[in-house]
Swiss-Prot record:
Stored InterPro entries: ERT1_acuK_gluconeogen_tf, PAS, PAS-like_dom_sf, PAS_13, Zn2-C6_fun-type_DNA-bd_sf, Zn2Cys6_DnaBD
Cellular localisation: Nucleus
Gene: ERT1
DNA-binding region per UniProt: 30-58
Keyword Phosphoprotein: no
Domain PAS: 445-518
Alphabetical GO biological process terms: carbon catabolite activation of transcription; carbon catabolite repression of transcription; cellular response to starvation; gluconeogenesis; positive regulation of gluconeogenesis; positive regulation of transcription by RNA polymerase II
Annotated protein name in UniProt: Transcription activator of gluconeogenesis ERT1
Length: 565
């Protein structure tokens, strides 16, 4: 073949390609084209599947599950659901469908203490069976889209209403994520509602479910419960469902002001119903105030079962052992109050932040000022002699002999014998200047840690390698009930005095392993803390961090404790 003929053939092929219509790209291929890596079209079934006889099984290929959809049920991500969501927009959406979704979701959560979650197919079927058709797309005027469907399903709704909350509560109990604050619960429910509305109901607009402006807000997260009133019209045979939102129950709202005799204002039927519901709520709140008397029981946020610890503005201090004792007393003397609070949420505690001029803060700062340096220059100027660890060891041995029997003392001595030779070998070569520098490093490190401990909110205590307590955080005093005067006074206490017998033995065994073992020196364990009340012991999870000086010798142990509830 000559060059002219080859060029002519190439030109003919190019002309054919230019005349051939370009195939449009599709956003999503079908399952068969996706497996074969072939170009697909937007039709279902696509042309390629029709030619191959696979038109009956041609559907959108499943996409990889996104990480942010981890808590969305699988039924919400089926291809047919996604296809409906893609074809569903504001132009073909029915006002009655959006209206029924709002009305019945609010009804379901009216007597529920859980965060709103997505419906499953079974609940959706129950809702649609109340007289609504899934394919019902007829347009109605805005003032009729909530009245006519209810007229057709009023009798059926009364039968189904009692079963929906029970079914929903069973599903929500296994899927709800609990947080220790209503703010976190509300934020989580809002984010979940956005995802679930987009994929389950085909709604691509931002959902406000679970927010203060939404009528589907859970009563557990709202200061007011939702009120639903039904008024019937015998002439037309229609029922109107008036949803009262938390905003509608505001006492400062003009619409809900009570009627004043002699005024020109005439109360409407809606105002009368709203005022009646507010009066009922006022009676309930007054009864609750008499039951949940803070003078009788510790201060508590009853909506999330969270008790307040620490100092208050009235210079009253709520210690953890006192609150635990009060809760046990409540459980024995007033079980109805106890079980009502615990049925709402798991038991939790919070520590308040008080101003610096509080009486409690001033007393604790006065104790710290006597034995704690505030500036680095003060450390280098006043620390002129080494810290003597010998009296501390003698006092520790004397205390252990008074408290423990001989078998336990032998086990403790075995643990001490494991690290004692290493201590002697490391300190023999140190001069007096080195020992002074070692103490300066201790105080300087303690000053640095104080800045973090004050803002951490975690009960923290610091002790030397001998076990002598050197620093105590305010939260640790609130947790155990010990005061800083008792722990940091002239007669210093040892950390073993705050632990029960088993925890003391475990402490020495653990210290012998990390003293010259892992250089990081951090470990997690459990221990039982003793309180000034001999009958109250606190089981805690603790994190012990061993800090070494420049010579590699264990200098201090930082202990963080959290109660196991």
């Amino acid at each position: 073949m000559s060059s002219d003929e080859s060029e002519r053939t190439v030109s003919v092929k190019q002309e054919d390609d230019s005349l051939r219509p370009k195939r449009k790209k599709t956003n999503r291929a079908c399952n068969h084209c996706h497996k074969a890596h072939m170009t697909c079209d937007s039709g279902r079934p696509c042309k390629r599947c029709i030619q191959r006889g696979l038109d009956k099984t041609c559907e959108d290929a499943r996409r990889k599950r996104k990480k942010y959809l981890a808590d969305v049920p699988n039924t919400a991500l089926l291809p047919n659901r996604l296809q409906q969501a893609e074809t569903y927009d504001g132009t073909n959406a029915s006002p009655t469908e959006s209206g029924r979704s709002i009305m019945y979701q609010a009804t379901t959560f009216q007597h529920s203490s859980t965060v709103p979650i997505s419906y499953t197919n079974s609940i959706n079927d129950d809702i649609y069976s109340l007289g609504f058709s899934k394919s019902h797309n007829s347009f109605l005027p805005r003032n009729q889209n909530q009245t006519q469907p209810l007229a057709r399903s009023q009798s059926t709704f009364s039968q189904k209403q009692s079963t929906l909350p029970q079914t929903h509560s069973n599903l929500s109990s296994s899927r709800r994520t609990n947080f220790l604050s209503s703010a976190a619960d509300l934020e989580y429910s809002t984010l979940s509602s956005i995802l679930q509305d987009n994929f389950m109901h085909g709604n691509h607009s931002t959902s406000n479910e679970g927010t203060p402006n939404s009528i589907t807000l859970s009563p557990a997260l709202s200061p007011h419960a939702l009120t639903t009133t039904v008024s019937s019209n015998t002439n037309t045979g229609t029922a109107t469902r008036n949803m009262t939102t938390p905003d509608d129950l505001n006492y400062t709202s003009k619409r809900n002001k009570p009627y004043v005799a002699g005024s020109s204002q005439t109360p409407s039927p809606q105002d009368q119903l709203s005022n009646g519901s507010m009066e009922a709520k006022a009676r309930i709140s007054n009864a609750s105030a008499s039951i949940y008397d803070h003078q009788r029981y510790p201060k508590c946020d009853e909506s999330i079962n969270q008790y307040f610890l620490g100092p208050t503005e009235s210079d009253q201090v709520s210690m953890f052992p006192d609150v635990i004792t009060a809760i046990e007393t409540m459980k024995a003397s007033d079980p109805s109050v106890f079980y009502e609070r615990n049925s709402k949420s798991a038991l939790s505690f919070t520590i308040g932040i008080v101003p610096d001029d509080n009486h409690y803060t001033k007393n604790h700062d006065s104790v710290e000022n006597e034995s704690f340096y505030k500036e680095p220059e003060e450390i280098y100027a006043k620390v002129k002699k080494p810290f003597s660890y010998t009296p501390g060891y003698h006092s520790l041995i004397a205390y252990l002999r008074k408290r423990f029997n001989k078998p336990m003392l032998v086990k403790m001595a075995e643990s001490m014998a494991a690290y004692r030779p290493s201590f002697i070998a490391c300190t023999n070569s140190l001069k007096e200047g080195d020992l002074i520098f070692m103490e300066q490093c201790f105080q300087r490190t303690l000053l640095t840690y104080d800045n973090f401990i004050r803002v951490s909110g975690t009960p923290t205590i610091v002790w030397r390698r001998t076990g002598e307590i050197a620093y105590v955080g305010n939260e640790f005093c609130i947790l155990t009930g010990w005061s800083k005067e008792e722990l940091l006074g002239k007669q210093r206490k040892f950390i073993v005095e705050l632990l029960d017998d088993k925890s003391v033995l475990e402490y020495f065994q653990l210290f012998s392993r990390i003293a010259f073992g892992d250089f990081l020196g951090a470990t997690m364990t459990e221990c039982t803390l003793l309180t000034p009340k001999t009958d109250v012991k606190i089981r805690t999870g603790c994190m012990w961090t061993l800090k070494r000086d420049v010579f590699g010798i264990p200098m201090m142990i930082v202990g963080n404790f959290l109660p196991i509830l």
